[in-house]
Amino acid sequence: HSFIKNLLLDNLLLVDIYNRAKKLHIEADVRRVVMILEMPQEKDHSSMESVKSLFGGKSKDFITAVDEKSIIVVKELEDGENYPEMDQLAHTILDTLGMGNDGKTHMAYGTIVNELKEVSRSYKEARMALDVGKIFFGDKEVIAYSSLGIGRLIYQLPIPLCKMFIKEIFGGKSPDDFDEETLVTIDKFFENSLNVSETSRQLYIHRNT
């Protein structure tokens, strides 16, 4: 699995990716997606084995890890498989491990890529989805990079710029000073990617309010 780890971490030259893949009989031009399961504490051996058994030892899928708390799945997609199936698979993995609805375990996945060299991008996207998900979608167990909405944009802004904006808009007011109704409205506004019409519809209030 050292090849897959190095591939995920972007440690290989393009020529090495294809040469080593050829030696290991790994197809280069197939659809793949990277999924990351992140646990609140260090994973044990049984968690890794449970995930592996879910995939039935398929040689085309790779299950590995690059740190203590995560299990990474590099999944090869069958014809007809797309994001809805990946979402379903992520929930199945959480349920199989008995970690569904614990509020502490999350699963994220990047975009589907068509070439082996793009696997590291899908991995980076899944990592970002985990981070953004914790900030903007704390109640979600499964987070897709392609569904992050405005959160993906805000997360990539420089922190000093965000602080300047908050100071400019709110002055000396702290978020703790807002009443519950205002906080719910703001939360719903972000949830709907700053769509005023959809936010007002869900809150049953007029958009001008």
Q: Residues of each region from the PLM?
A:
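Cytosolic nucleotide-utilizing catalytic cores of signal-transduction proteins
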Residues: 1-209
